Amino acid sequence: MLSLPPPEFYKLWIINKSPYQLFNIYRSGIMKVKVLDASAIIHGYNPIIEEGEHYTTPEVLEEIESKKIIVEQALDFGKLKIMSPNREYIKKVEEVVKKTGDNLSQQDIGVLALALNLNAILYTDDYGIQNVAKKLNIEVRGIAFEPTNKDFIWRKICEGCKKLYPVDYEEDICEICGSPLKRKMVKSRLKKKRKKK
């Protein structure tokens, strides 16, 4: 079921957009809620000049000193809101992060949880965040770079015999040959089977 549009949707009526045009704009995602991580703001995303509702977390604000003026203006104009996600969504993200092995900070997890909480589009150039977002079916858009289309997980790999271990494997030495282990990105997407002619 389609939820009611945000206030910006109705403001567009004033500039003589037809109801049909307005509805298409809303459905296209322009007016959808957007969550911004630190990389999105640092790489030039400006909530003041963009349509839609923008949110970020308190932790992100601590990392974006270089864009402090823009952020403060966006907050003053009501174009950016600060919100912490509900704990249940943080737990969901943490479960996925544990499976993928992505090395994400609590700030990264918070941004993902907020996007999940608000059913929002997530703006980020961080490939680790994008990877976890895919697993959570969160729509992602990049700013300076196109979002990665790769689907991967992290594993530990033996430098000697190449045996793979889960990323949370506690030892740093291979149980088979005794060589050291290192983290490695592994594709998790299965290759599609070719159809028989």
Curated annotation (Swiss-Prot):
SUPFAM superfamilies in UniProt: PIN domain-like
EC primary class: hydrolase
InterPro entries found in the cross-reference section: NOB1, PIN-like_dom_sf, PIN_dom, Ribonuclease_PIN, VapC_family
Chain sites annotated for binding Mn(2+): 37
Molecular-function annotations in GO: magnesium ion binding; RNA endonuclease activity; rRNA binding
Pfam families: PIN_6 (PF17146)
Co-factor binding comment: Binds 1 zinc ion per subunit.
Gene3D superfamilies the record matches: 5'-nuclease (3.40.50.1010)
Region named Zinc ribbon: 153-188
Protein EC: 3.1.-.-
GO cellular component: preribosome, small subunit precursor
Keywords assigned: Endonuclease, Hydrolase, Manganese, Metal-binding, Nuclease, Ribosome biogenesis, RNA-binding, rRNA-binding, Toxin-antitoxin system, Zinc
Residues given in the record as Zn(2+) binding sites: 158, 161, 174, 177
Lineage: superkingdom: Archaea
Alphabetical GO biological process terms: maturation of SSU-rRNA
NCBIfam families: PRK12496.1-4 (NF009147)
Record HAMAP family: VapC_Nob1
Comment text on domains: Has 2 structurally independent domains; the N-terminal PINc domain which binds Mn(2+), rRNA substrate and probably has endoribonuclease activity, and the C-terminal zinc ribbon domain which also binds rRNA substrate.
Similarity comment: Belongs to the PINc/VapC protein family.
Function: Toxic component of a type II toxin-antitoxin (TA) system. Processes pre-16S-rRNA at its 3' end (the D-site) to yield the mature 3' end.
The protein's name: Endoribonuclease Nob1
Species the sequence originates in: Methanocaldococcus jannaschii (strain ATCC 43067 / DSM 2661 / JAL-1 / JCM 10045 / NBRC 100440)
